[in-house]
Amino acid sequence: MPRLSNSCLKVARCCLYFALLNGISSAQAETRALGFAGVNLSGAEFASSKKPGILNKDYTYPASSDYSYFSNAGMNTIRLPVLWERLQPNALGELDPTQMAQLQLAVARAKAWGMYLIIDIHNYGKYYGGKIGGPQTPISTFTDVWRRLAKAFNSDNAVIFGLMNEPNNISAREWAGAAQAAINAIRETRANNLILVPGALWTGAHSWDKPTNDGSSNATALTSIYDPLNRYAFEVHQYLDADSSGTRGVCGSSTVGVDRLRKFTDWLRANRKLGFLAEFGSANDPVCNDALSEMLGYIEKNVDVWMGWTWWAAGAWWNSSYAFNVYPNKDGTNKPQMAILSPLATRATRVPAAAAARVPRVQPLR
């Protein structure tokens, strides 16, 4: 389809982006755009068994061209998975300067293209294998890393804090306590960044009301989450294969995505909360493509409770045969799913981060 030149699009996006940081008008918010649409750019979390590993041998960070490609495709949000142990090699210790330099460069590259960057601690609720809240990794260890990150990116509205990727092997009640402690630690630094709060059970939308090992569910345990600035959303993941694991390319039906989001959407509305679909993916076949279009269309129709989405995944180091990989081909051509994602992202971000306007404005901290 016709496109602006790269330079014109970049200038337009940056102007709109910085206009947002100076405050979105209520008239803009009323256009009901989702606001956030993008992709997970993997690489920094690769070779997770190698701690810390060697940069650009075991793991890598996205190149500047990665941001430009997805920005030109209409996206405005990058979710950046990173390993906690690389960011903070020692519990309660300083953040690693090499990793922080890479993170700061990632933020700068995202902002240069008018994009938001989600820092995703991609650790599944553990640190060096120790469950958050357990004897090896007390909650104070978890709050420490977020306190340090909050100080580093304090009130940079381009940076979104993703507390933890897919917590598991932890009850919803235990996780709710850890998440609340992290929110408290972040706000104590006076940072007003948007926070994404996942649930237990790999934060599946389909399993939001399922009991964990102590009988509590995300639907019950997380209703009490409190942010004094009310600048947060609940992060969920939802894949379209039979068991929602994202390990297979086959989709059950064209309505499977909508069916699995429906209860969570109802929960958001009943509890006056906001949601963010931070991971989802499907293979390129007719049923999956229909399911993908239907699911993202459903989110757009329920913009009163959904803030946005980020596809899983892209990144230069993904095998080109990986079914969910939307990183461009070596010849520069697009992966098939981009024919669905790009126009939907462009429409969703027509008012940059309009969803952010539905989060109460930050009041000066006293």
Segments (PLM) and residue ranges:
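Solvent-exposed loop/turn segments at secondary-structure junctions
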Residues: S42-A47, T77, L83-Q88, N123-Y127, ...
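Extracellular glycoside hydrolase catalytic/binding regions
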Residues: L55, Y59-T60, T143-R147, K151, ...
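An active-site-proximal structural segment forming one wall of the substrate-binding cleft
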Residues: D58-N76, E94-N123, Y128-I160, E174-T189, ...
